[in-house]
From Swiss-Prot:
This is Transcription elongation factor GreA. Keywords: Coiled coil, DNA-binding, Transcription, Transcription regulation. Belongs to the GreA/GreB family. It holds the Pfam family GreA_GreB. It comes from Mesomycoplasma hyopneumoniae (strain 232) (Mycoplasma hyopneumoniae).
Amino acid sequence: MKNTVNDKILLTQQKLEEIEKELEHLINVERVNVIQEIKDARSQGDLSENAEYDVAREKQGIIESRIRELETIISKAKIIKADLGSSRVSIGSKVSLENVESGEIQTFQIVSSIDADPFKSKISNFSPIAQALLGQHQGDEVEVDVNEKYSVRILEVINE
């Protein structure tokens, strides 16, 4: 599995808390509801032609599968901690950079692929831009290759 270090899954503390909250909801709400749906469908009699029963059983399978997946992620979670006070780019760093040619400035956080959410300016550590930036320092100029090559200057690295 990607994003593993010695079979650990890299996550931010925030993402781990989101996963734990989702797991709690699935166990305490969704699982209970689907069990009731199955009971209600069974009470309608013949299961061989009972579409409600089939739908509820399929839904139960999806819920149970997601519960197992989340439990595995939690059991293998390793919290990402940025290098506090360092100007070096690492997983967990918030980075501001400037495209040397266009002057365009971007700011994002480098996170694991499980945490990645481009709409929240969180990019995967496996993305080409993150790969180019990891290990670099504030002030460095780095070449990035995404369909075409371009240079960026690291303006700021925040590790908190």
